[in-house]
């Protein structure tokens, strides 16, 4: 793959030539091939146009789901275990980047809440379901989507339950553990798939209740399935799961998002930065091992309750591809979001929110309010 070094140089040429990308641009996507190690971006200066440090708030501990963001710094970043941060130069762009872990480091609050509580944060991980729900109270705009399908799942012990659908889970009355504020749970309840009296928002990411009780629990197809079957000593047996995507909640998971004013105030920054994000994602997916190893090291340096393994991280990347969770998006390039798909979700999701008495969404919200493909480079492709 062309490295970030090459990608940044090509980007600089493209910007000089005035080749701006929009979500209606038609071009033949180019497949790139990964280098053996992460290379630093070269040829694009972000000095004076992007915040320095450029801070990204993620939604959880460092893991392959966030690898493309950590990969912008590379493997030589510095860990602050107390604050859950990873900091280093954003290649040769002239600025520093900091990636912040979520979960306990932000009080288990959604990244959108932290985004608006801390003005230092420039970008945050926000799924489009949450962005729709909070489009009035905490508005954000997605500029890059790593996921084509959300890896979010509900999982259970097949020795305790036999479920083929979300209706089955609801009919069983089984307790369902989830993180408070998760938009998908509002959807499942609002659509009548689960009942409000069977769900429990006290989940903190730990395995204890799943191991000791017969519960259904949220997780990621790219993480918890492998962890429970292979790494958690108290379990190490099969789990079954269903993708939330298959319930009709077809969100773009964990999109890299900015506040609406950044589309104008930081437009020059986004025009230069977002293609580097695309290239970082392609680089990671084509050669995941260096960053998978580093992510495992970071988790161990954080020394918290969350665990990881290189086997888990390598399996995660395989699941991303095998289950079609990560792929090129609209028009055949990475990061693009389909506005028709988002609008279709809005048409289903907003009435559910209204029925639940949730009033945080913008009246008349549409895809253009919460997402844009304007900053993407259509020549940067995974090739699958």
Name every feature range the model reports, one short phrase each:
Residues 129-130, 204-208, 212-303:
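Pocket-lining segment of extracytoplasmic ligand-binding domains
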Residues 266-355:
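Secondary-structure end/capping motifs
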Residues 40-202, 208, 215-218, 242:
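Short, glycine-/small- and polar/acidic-enriched structural segments
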Residues 21-29:
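Bacterial lipoprotein signal-peptidase II cleavage site
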Residues 77-93, 243-249, 264, 325-339:
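Short, solvent-exposed loop/beta-turn-alpha elements that line the ligand-binding surface or hinge
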Residues 1-8:
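Bacterial N-terminal signal peptides that target proteins for export
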Residues 339-384:
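Conserved C-terminal helix/tail region of periplasmic/extracytoplasmic solute-binding proteins
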Residues 14-19:
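C-terminal motif of bacterial Sec signal peptides marking the signal peptidase cleavage site
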């Amino acid at each position: 793959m062309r490295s970030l070094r090459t990608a940044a140089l090509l980007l600089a040429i493209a910007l000089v030539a005035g080749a701006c990308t929009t979500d209606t641009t038609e071009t033949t996507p180019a497949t790139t091939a990964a280098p053996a190690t992460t290379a630093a971006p070269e040829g694009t200066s972000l000095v004076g146009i992007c915040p320095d440090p450029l801070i990204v708030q993620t939604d959880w501990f460092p893991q392959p789901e966030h690898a493309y963001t950590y990969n912008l710094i590379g493997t030589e970043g510095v860990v602050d275990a107390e604050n859950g941060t990873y900091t280093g130069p954003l290649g040769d762009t002239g600025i520093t980047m900091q990636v912040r872990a979520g979960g306990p480091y932000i009080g288990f609050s959604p990244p959108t809440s932290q985004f608006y509580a801390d003005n230092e944060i420039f970008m945050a991980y926000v799924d489009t379901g949450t962005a729709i729900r909070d489009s009035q109270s905490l508005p954000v705009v997605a500029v890059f989507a790593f996921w084509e399908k959300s890896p979010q799942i509900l999982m259970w012990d097949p020795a305790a339950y036999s479920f083929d659908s979300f209706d089955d889970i609801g009919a069983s009355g089984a307790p369902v553990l989830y993180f408070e504020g998760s938009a998908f749970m509002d959807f499942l309840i609002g659509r009548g798939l689960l009942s409000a009296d069977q769900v429990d928002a006290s989940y903190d990411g730990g395995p204890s209740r799943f191991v000791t009780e017969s519960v259904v629990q949220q997780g990621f197809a790219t993480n918890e399935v492998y962890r429970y079957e292979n790494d958690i000593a108290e379990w190490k047996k099969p789990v079954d799961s269903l993708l939330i995507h298959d319930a009709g909640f077809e969100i773009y998971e964990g999109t890299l998002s900015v506040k609406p004013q950044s589309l104008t105030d930081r437009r020059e920054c986004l025009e230069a930065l977002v293609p580097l994000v695309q290239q970082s994602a392609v680089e990671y997916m084509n050669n995941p091992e260096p960053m998978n190893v580093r992510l495992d090291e970071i988790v161990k340096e954080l020394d918290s309750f969350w665990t990881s393994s290189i086997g888990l991280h390598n399996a995660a990347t395989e699941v991303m591809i095998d289950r079609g969770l990560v792929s090129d998006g609209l028009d055949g390039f990475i990061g693009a979001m389909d506005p028709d798909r988002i609008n279709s979700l809005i048409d289903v999701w907003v009435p559910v929110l209204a029925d639940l008495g949730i009033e945080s969404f913008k009246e008349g919200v549409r895809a253009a309010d919460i997402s844009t493909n304007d900053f993407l480079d259509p020549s940067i492709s995974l090739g699958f």
